[in-house]
């Protein structure tokens, strides 16, 4: 990817010089269905002015902007046919270099026309092309964030150069085209259809979109209280159309419109709102203005777990929120990306909790989003929420748990700090002041300070401009009768963390155990809420009271911090974790325990036992999903190598018993069955999985649909109890893109050195592998819980191949590969030094691009953490 970067300084200088009026983009996609055609014709005409000269009046000659007036426009194309600037032909060989077209001798008003052949992509960047194996139909969609509009047309690729875009798109007969403007009636010629779209509102290039193909859909409308009507549409490819629950998606969208328009006090800014579920999508979704794209595994062809349905709801409302916060009002530069994403993450969780059946969405936020944030914030690459973004590579690696989840948690705290009414009053003022323009964090804070009367400078410094997470520790002393004589919260800075002490609003919940054995209950009997600031904060409300069985610090999850319970509360809470009557306090306690495991302060076996105990009663789908994921990490990474065989067997036995005992047809039953397949190793366990797959010993209420069939088969393959014959048979049964991808995962899961080597070669050598096939192959390659020694040869292979992957792949594909080709699973095997391998690479690559080094450094962080957790477990023996 050399030569495709853009620095903040370059963007700022260009924004000072250039004002873009409009783009006219003509795309000929008539040959898209022919796989032999690797490119398409792109013709871009852009009108722009230069700020150093006065625009010409009617009938006046164009004024020169000065002999030194020059800039550049961005384009990534295999071939540029012609470049015409103000009527002058420019030689592409001279002015088109490293994804830039140099534009010199500019006038006050300029017109540039660029004709190029741009490439169809299979990486989910630019214009992605996909042919559906189910019916051989071809589909296209664009994905432009961060810098990939330039893969489709010539563009000033930065968020603060907004303009109006007019798209004209030619496609084969039978296709439709969706874009930011409403789809017009096409004209017909030579077996093709041409759609000439109306100009868009002023928007940034990264939220423009073209979606083309034989998509199927449903339409509806949102009727606002003031009489406005916004057309709505939902679309997917033809082979999935029967599975798309359009009514639920459209109802959620209508409710979201009503909720946001009232909350923001600002009408929807665009002319219509389409949502298209597209294949092989790299992210969850993308907020293209009025033309949102979602990954199409949100169209459920098999029964999903409730956690997945809730995630779709959050995603739908996240993208809708961006129409106001990100699309109508847009960041000036990518350093405020966090504000776009954090706000959308916060407000979509709030909207889900207040407008859908997922009323406990904040519990999901606690275990999944905040868990992601805490992990990210303790890496060596941690950065402030408001990160310094110096170039495009910086922003590409900052789509992370800090930018999304920590930022959302901090905004939640900000709402509490200024008050909900003041917060949303400030949001209304901010949106009104900057509609269709660009703004910064300072602009938002100014509005919040104005309406709340609070000075946010100190709050902003410690929460947004400083990295890291602090620790809150409960300190309790009692007398011989169990009466609390001293209670305080100690705030600490973890070793090596760049954090400073911060103000927190926290609650302490007092929980009492009642009953015994299976009838025991752990219920809240008291609650104290207070402000924490500085190193020690006394809690006088607890002094003189009888010590509760469990004291939950940060009860109700009000703040963002690592939490350390007192030892008695931790011990009692873990022993009675299945006695909590609500999911949230149980999740908070287990999150604290998990953080201890990751820090090498609590043996993983203790967490494993508590998690299995919690699964006996836990009904919250996202909490179950989170616990099962952490169980997998314990078994594959955090337990010492010598402990794993026994632990895997015992855990799979426990999961099998839980699956058999689960309520028939329940969400928990489905998740537990999948978990058994993931960990099955003994004869009894694999026979049970095989019997579910064949239907010879069905579980009451369990529907073994196609997606579950793949889960069960892949588990058997990874356990060595099924192989190529079974994979090929299942692939022939499922002639879809999902079937093709899951077959790739299954083949990479085969537990032999030969299969792992073959998967490695495909991943590092086949640059044509579609992005989602790559993801599934990586997942299978890493599936070595039962035999981690299979990945030992690839420690040195990784070190050898890393440079080539970075140099030859697009950023997204390189990031995927460099992250997931590394696994800490071999840590602890005799004669293996994965930590030394990565340390050696970093020492010899001090001048490598910062984004490249960051990926490798994060792998090293994870590997060191694995070693620390294993050492903690070994010391407890």
Question: Where are the language model's segments positioned?
Answer:
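Hydrophobic alpha-helical and helix-loop surface patches within well-folded domains
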Residues: 197, 228, 233-497, 633, ...
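Short, hydrophobic/aromatic-enriched beta-strand segments in well-ordered soluble domains
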Residues: 42-48, 75, 109-123, 165-173, ...
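Short coil-to-beta strand junction motifs in C2/discoidin
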Residues: 74-79, 161, 499-506
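A surface-exposed beta-strand-loop module
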Residues: 53-54, 66-67, 71, 75-133, ...
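N-terminal, polar/Ser/Thr-rich
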Residues: 1-41, 53-54, 133-139, 157-159, ...
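Hydrophobic helix-coil surface modules that form long, contiguous segments used
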Residues: 42, 147, 155-317, 346, ...
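Non-catalytic accessory/interaction domains
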Residues: 2, 58-64, 168-171, 176, ...
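Glycine/proline-rich low-complexity spacer/linker segments in large multi-domain proteins
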Residues: 8-17, 115-166, 213-221, 557-583, ...
């Amino acid at each position: 990817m050399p030569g495709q970067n853009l620095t903040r300084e370059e963007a700022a200088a260009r924004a000072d010089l250039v004002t873009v009026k409009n783009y006219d983009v003509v795309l000929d996609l008539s040959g898209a269905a022919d796989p032999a055609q690797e490119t398409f014709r792109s013709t871009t005409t852009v009108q722009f002015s230069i700020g150093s000269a006065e625009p010409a009046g009617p009938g006046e000659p164009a004024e020169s902007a000065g002999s030194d007036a020059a800039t550049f426009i961005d384009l990534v194309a295999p071939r540029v046919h012609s470049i015409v600037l103000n009527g002058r032909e420019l030689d592409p060989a001279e002015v088109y270099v490293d994804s830039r077209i140099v534009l010199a001798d500019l006038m006050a008003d300029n017109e540039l026309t660029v004709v190029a052949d741009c490439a169809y992509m299979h990486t989910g960047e630019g214009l992605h092309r996909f042919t559906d194996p189910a019916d051989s139909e071809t589909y296209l969609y664009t994905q432009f964030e961060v810098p990939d509009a330039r893969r489709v047309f010539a563009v000033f690729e930065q968020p603060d150069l907004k303009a109006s875009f007019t798209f004209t798109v030619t496609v084969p007969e039978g296709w439709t085209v969706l874009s930011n403007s409403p789809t017009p009636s096409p004209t017909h010629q030579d077996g093709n259809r041409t759609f000439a779209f109306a100009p868009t509102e002023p928007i940034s290039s990264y939220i423009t979109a073209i979606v083309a193909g034989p998509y199927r859909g449903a339409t509806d409308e949102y009727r606002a209280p003031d009489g406005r009507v916004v057309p709505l549409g939902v679309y997917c490819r033809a082979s999935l159309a029967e599975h798309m629950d359009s009514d639920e998606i459209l109802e959620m969208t209508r409710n979201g419109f009503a909720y946001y328009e009232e909350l923001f006090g600002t009408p929807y800014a665009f002319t219509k709102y389409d949502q298209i579920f597209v294949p092989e999508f790299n992210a969850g979704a993308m907020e293209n203005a009025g033309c949102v794209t979602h990954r199409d595994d949100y169209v459920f062809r098999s029964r999903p777990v409730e956690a997945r349905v809730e995630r779709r709801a959050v995603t739908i409302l996240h993208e809708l929120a961006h129409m106001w916060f990100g699309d109508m009002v847009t960041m000036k530069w990518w350093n405020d990306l966090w504000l776009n994403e954090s706000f959308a993450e916060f407000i979509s969780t709030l909207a889900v909790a207040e407008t859908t059946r997922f009323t406990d969405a904040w519990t999901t936020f606690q275990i999944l989003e905040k868990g992601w944030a805490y992990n990210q914030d303790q890496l060596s690459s941690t950065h402030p929420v408001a990160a310094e973004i110096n170039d495009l590579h910086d922003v590409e690696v900052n789509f992370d748990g800090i930018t999304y989840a920590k930022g959302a948690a901090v905004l939640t705290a900000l709402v509490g700090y200024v008050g909900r009414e003041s917060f949303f009053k400030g949001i209304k003022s901010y949106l009104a002041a900057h509609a269709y323009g660009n703004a910064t964090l300072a602009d938002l804070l100014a509005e919040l300070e104005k309406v709340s009367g609070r000075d946010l400078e100190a709050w902003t410094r410690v929460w947004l401009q400083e990295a890291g997470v602090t620790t809150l520790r409960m300190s309790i002393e009692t007398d011989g009768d169990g009466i609390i004589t001293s209670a305080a919260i100690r705030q600490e800075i973890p070793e090596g963390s760049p954090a400073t002490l911060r103000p927190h609003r926290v609650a302490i919940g007092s929980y009492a155990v009642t009953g015994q054995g299976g009838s025991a209950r752990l219920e809240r009997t008291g609650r104290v809420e207070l402000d924490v600031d500085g190193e020690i904060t006394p809690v006088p409300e607890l002094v003189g009271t009888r010590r509760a069985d469990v004291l939950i610090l940060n009860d109700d999850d009000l703040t963002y911090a690592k939490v350390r319970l007192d030892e008695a509360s931790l011990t009692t809470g873990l022993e009675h974790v299945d006695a909590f009557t609500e999911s949230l306090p149980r999740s908070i306690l287990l999150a604290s325990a998990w953080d201890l495991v990751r820090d090498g302060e609590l043996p993983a076996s203790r967490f494993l036992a508590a998690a299995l105990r919690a699964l006996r009663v836990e009904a919250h789908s996202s909490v179950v999903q989170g616990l099962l994921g952490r169980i997998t990490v314990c078994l594959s990474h955090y337990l010492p190598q010598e402990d794993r065989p026994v632990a895997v067997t015992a855990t799979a036995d426990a999961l099998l018993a839980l699956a058999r005992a689960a309520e028939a047809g329940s969400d928990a039953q489905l998740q537990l069955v999948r978990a058994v397949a993931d960990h099955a190793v003994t004869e009894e366990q694999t026979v049970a999985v095989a019997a579910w797959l064949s239907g010879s010993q069905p579980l009451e209420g369990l529907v073994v649909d196609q997606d579950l069939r793949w889960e069960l088969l892949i588990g058997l393959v990874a356990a060595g109890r099924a192989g190529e014959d079974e994979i090929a048979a299942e692939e022939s049964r499922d002639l879809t893109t999902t079937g093709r991808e899951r077959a790739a995962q299954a083949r990479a899961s085969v537990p032999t050195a030969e299969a792992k080597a073959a998967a490695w070669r495909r991943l590092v050598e086949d640059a044509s592998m579609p992005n989602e096939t790559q993801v599934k192959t990586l997942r299978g390659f890493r599936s070595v819980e039962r035999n981690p020694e299979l990945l030992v040869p690839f420690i040195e292979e990784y070190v050898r191949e890393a440079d080539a992957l970075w140099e030859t792949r697009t950023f997204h594909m390189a990031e995927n590969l460099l992250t997931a080709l590394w696994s800490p699973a071999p840590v602890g095997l005799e004669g293996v030094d994965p930590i030394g391998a990565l340390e050696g690479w970093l020492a010899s690559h001090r001048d490598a691009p910062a984004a490249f080094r960051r990926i490798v450094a994060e792998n090293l962080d994870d590997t060191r953490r694995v070693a620390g957790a294993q050492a903690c477990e070994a010391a407890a023996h």
